[in-house]
């Protein structure tokens, strides 16, 4: 059967990740959820959802699924946080900073798209913040991954160019 066949077996439904199934992502989501709790009163913590891959598996392949950061009801927005195993990467990042960057970015996408609001907000300037490595406050950051500096929520500031690091991810409270 080819992947375009109408006889293709149905995909499994997305499901919440089992405890311990994705330990690095679970640990980093706990950090991000501290910011969710501190900045969105009444918002329950985000969860990890696992959806089956829609692509055919390679011979002897194991489908561990695609991992998304989701609202408590299971809805998510954005890309999966786990690696494409066909490229030979490990399922979870080897370092905590990369995992934190992936999970915090996915959490921001999910919250902003599903709650229709900027998140998180700089209390000084009343604008949405961006995720980036600490100490790169000069201006817009090209998005290069820099695992030597911790991830922070960064504010573009006002029109006078007063951009600044606001807080380490997980410490907005």
List each model region and its residues.
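Cys/His-clustered metal-coordination modules, chiefly Zn-binding fingers
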Residues: 87-173
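N-terminal alpha-helical interaction blocks
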Residues: 2-91
């Amino acid at each position: 059967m080819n992947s375009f066949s109408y006889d293709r077996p149905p995909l499994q439904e997305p499901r919440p990740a089992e405890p311990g199934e994705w330990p690095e992502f679970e640990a980093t989501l706990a950090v991000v959820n501290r910011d969710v709790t501190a900045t969105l009163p009444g918002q329950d913590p985000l969860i990890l959802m696992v959806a089956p891959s829609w692509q055919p598996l390679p011979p002897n392949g194991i489908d561990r699924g695609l991992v998304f950061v989701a609202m408590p009801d299971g809805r998510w927005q954005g890309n999966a946080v786990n690696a494409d195993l066909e490229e030979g990467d490990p399922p979870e990042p080897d370092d905590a900073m990369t995992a934190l960057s992936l999970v915090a970015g996915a959490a921001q996408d999910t919250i902003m798209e599903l709650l229709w609001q900027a998140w998180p907000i700089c209390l000084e300037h009343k604008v949405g913040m961006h995720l980036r490595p600490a100490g790169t406050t000069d201006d817009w950051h090209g998005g290069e991954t820099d695992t030597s500096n911790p991830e922070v929520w960064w504010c573009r500031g006002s029109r006078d160019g007063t951009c600044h690091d606001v807080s380490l991810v997980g410490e907005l409270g």
